[in-house]
Amino acid sequence: MSTLLIELLTEELPPKALARLGEAFARGLFDGLSAQGLLEEGAAVEGFATPRRLAASITGARRTAPDRELREKVLPVTIAFDAEGKPAAPLVKKLAALAKTVGVEVIAAESLERGPDGKAEALFYRYTARGAVLADGLQTALSQTIANLPIPKVMTYQRPNGENVQFVRPAHKLIALLDSEVIPVSAFGLQSGNVTLGHRFLSAGEIVIQDAASYASTLESQGKVIAGYGKRKEAIRAELLKTAGADTVVMPEALLDEVNALVEWPVVYPCHFEEAFLAVPQECLILTMQTNQKYFALTDAQGHLRNRFLIVSNIATDTPEAIIQGNERVVRPRLADARFFFEQDKKKPLADRVPLLSRVVYHNKIGTQLERVSRLQAIAGQLAEKLGADVAHASRGALLAKADLLTDMVGEFPELQGTMGTYYARHDGEPDDVALACSEHYQPRFAGDALPSTATGTVVALADKLETLVGIWGIGLQPTGEKDPFALRRHALGILRMLIEKPLALTIDDALQIAAASFDGIAAVKPNLAAITDFLYDRLRGYLKDKGYSTNEVEAVVSQRPQRLDDIVARLEAVRAFAALPQAEALAAANKRITNILKKTDVAIGAVQPPLLKEDAERALHQSVVSAEPQVHDAFARGDFTTALKTLAGLREAVDTFFDGVMVMADDTALRDNRLALLAELHGLMNRVADISKLAA
């Protein structure tokens, strides 16, 4: 297969957009050529992206696309000809336009085919479309790809000839190479060739790409450029780990991506800062190194910050002392600022900052952060009472939860809200669980994040999420489609995870009603607890499916809308065990049948009257239900849901016999009502743990 190379050499591209630009450039060219038939079956594309270039290498490119036999609809027959059967004006006009499009002088009406078009008879023109030539097809694909790139911000620059050009950054060279042959295309006033530039400092002069397949290796050997985005990123990761030695690299993927987008020939150097800075909370130091300097912090085996850090340079040298000293010099003022913020913040207790939250607007329809804190205290206090947590500590934790929003450190680094509250609360002598609640009430911050570790933190976290969910929903800002500006989906999932995973003996209704009561007197807030409850159960379904439970298993439990979720996993495991029994399928089908029968009845169903049980089958079923009831109820009371459901397996024979030999909807109303009562009793027993009808195929 032939290899096609396209490279666009530019000034330094925006680091945070480089990965997206590289992917879009490669995919756009591939799709554009594929749509024109210029790629063979099995063709593949490899994208390249560095700070100064976007490139794509496509294997399986064709010089010419195959010809295609096309059949194009012209007009319905009813309007194509006049009364005498001659071509009418619409047909003449259409054929003239079509001839121009196809590239022929004239299309005779006699050359058209007749055939159905699904509605009526129509005229069709059959012709051979010549396959696109690579140069033309590539020009089209390149122009479309450039136009569709996800450019964060366009800049205007001027070519040497005075032409104004708009692109993400000035473009300097263009390569278009099929194997070793230059394909003539253009972009931004540049004509394609086979010449590029290597590293801005480590490579001298132009580099000729002799063959498209050798692009990456030529750039690496001659130009000191690792062109592959992924390859360069993994090289950085490996070098960081190697240089760190026994220490652990604090290496968030976002930082790794950003640094990768800043270098073409990455080299890692170790640096140091004064140990005195370690008196500042390590989260502050790590964040300032990452955010302001793009450095990688190091921690020891216990997770404590070291006074060493790693930098990724774009310069390889045998004498890196100047690079190391320069980076050590610029980080000191940043660390000194963090230390200053920390020392200044400690001078004012968190509790003294709380009244100033009246200056911070939470939402113009709901009020200030101070008003919100008052609601959090009310909610947290009631939740603590219900859950047996320390009410005073919960109220204190809620009072201080948002106070660090007014500190200098959080003003500089908003990501540290909560974290700094814990440090400052401990400095102020607050109980440890109260201090921890300042940070833990934000947990879980994202999917898979840890839950609060303390009872106080859990209660305040629940209060925070419930207040947000009920309040924001209550002013009409519930999630819609892809929009969820207040992260209500995340808050809902956090509530569910705490109820399930802690677990907490708290009903959904109680939690929502406590939160709703805190908004009494705020006219703008109209809590819609029914809609929020539906929303929570929908999120619950997704959470449980992500845990590996099947749709049927989840529906069997969630369709009953259990109020307490502390036993939901046990119910699901019981459903799974029941579904594996040989009797499960028949009982699930029978339960579904019973559900449908009971739905259709419009009479009040009372208790079973044994004297009215006339048939042997119904007497046997009643006896089976009476025998199973105490076992099921006892197992349910113990939380042994598996035993409760497995006990139902013993009913299978009696249920089958009943439906085979007993007419439920008998003409005798007394018999009918008694049989409905028997089915209702059976239905209640079968659905005590879960709605097993949901297991029916």
Curated annotation (Swiss-Prot):
Tell me the enzyme class: ligase
Q: Which reaction does it catalyse?
A: tRNA(Gly) + glycine + ATP = glycyl-tRNA(Gly) + AMP + diphosphate
Q: What domain of life is recorded for the organism?
A: Bacteria
Question: What are the subcellular locations of this protein?
Answer: Cytoplasm
Where does this chain mainly localize? Answer: cytoplasm
- What SUPFAM superfamilies is this protein classified in? HD-domain/PDEase-like (SSF109604)
Please provide the record's keywords in A-Z order: Aminoacyl-tRNA synthetase, ATP-binding, Cytoplasm, Ligase, Nucleotide-binding, Protein biosynthesis
Cellular component, GO annotation? cytosol
Q: Which GO terms describe its biological process?
A: arginyl-tRNA aminoacylation; glycyl-tRNA aminoacylation
Question: Mind listing the GO molecular function terms for this protein?
Answer: arginine-tRNA ligase activity; ATP binding; glycine-tRNA ligase activity
Name the Enzyme Commission number(s) assigned to this protein. 6.1.1.14
Entry-linked HAMAP family: Gly_tRNA_synth_beta (MF_00255)
Checking PANTHER family in the record gives: GLYCINE--TRNA LIGASE, CHLOROPLASTIC_MITOCHONDRIAL 2, GLYCYL-TRNA SYNTHETASE
Q: How does it assemble?
A: Tetramer of two alpha and two beta subunits.
Q: Report the sequence similarity comment from the record.
A: Belongs to the class-II aminoacyl-tRNA synthetase family.
**What protein is this chain from?**
Glycine--tRNA ligase beta subunit
Q: Which organism is it from?
A: Ralstonia pickettii (strain 12J)
What is the organism lineage in this UniProt record? Answer: Bacteria, Pseudomonadati, Pseudomonadota, Betaproteobacteria, Burkholderiales
